[in-house]
């Protein structure tokens, strides 16, 4: 499973990259056939948004989350 992370108005640090990778590894337990995950993190003033597109054998799954803290947005995104 390949995880791509893109930042819009945010620098993706190594710690943030590792946090995302560890969170999305849990998804493999629920979806054994995940091919690719693309995560986009966006910062606009005080709005933090995390969105992800999972490519699986039978199509795509999309989810997004907005919070005041990026780590909280990522947590909620994975929980969806």
Segments and roles (model prediction):
Residues 1-80:
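N-terminal, polar/charged subdomain of small-to-medium soluble alpha/beta proteins
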């Amino acid at each position: 499973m390949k995880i791509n992370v893109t930042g819009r108005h945010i620098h993706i640090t190594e710690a943030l990259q590792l946090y995302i990778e560890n969170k999305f590894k849990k998804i493999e337990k629920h979806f054994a056939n995940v091919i690719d995950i693309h995560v986009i993190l966006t910062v606009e003033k005080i709005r933090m948004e995390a969105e992800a597109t999972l490519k699986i054998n039978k199509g795509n799954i999309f989810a997004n989350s907005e919070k005041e803290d990026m780590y909280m947005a990522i947590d909620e995104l994975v929980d969806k």
